[in-house]
Amino acid sequence: MAGVWVFEDGMVRRADSEAPSRGRGVGGGGGGGKVLVHVPSSEVVTSYEVLERRLRELGWERYLNDPCLLQFHQRSTVHLISVPRDFSRLKLVHMYDVVVKTRNVFEVRDAATTASPP
């Protein structure tokens, strides 16, 4: 994969992964970020209340035992969705975790081209 890679403290990361318009989560930066969208309703996930409501509709349950994370589990699978408790820290990797574990229900889209329905 092309780009600038940085090796720091025993870890490798893409240098551009921390640009202000990327990875800052929903609504972060100058409009160049990504948003998590509930596909059936075209609703942009703007809070954990929205995410939790949509996940509950799919049979996901929230675990309440971690002080740093919000975790959701679906009894019929081994999947566990973990997101930071602070919504402003939601990053692209968390969004794709939701997408992968709820196939065809959520998508990650460009924030600049996605508008919430009125």
Curated annotation (Swiss-Prot):
GO terms for biological process: regulation of flower development. Belongs to the FPF1 family. This is Flowering-promoting factor 1-like protein 4.
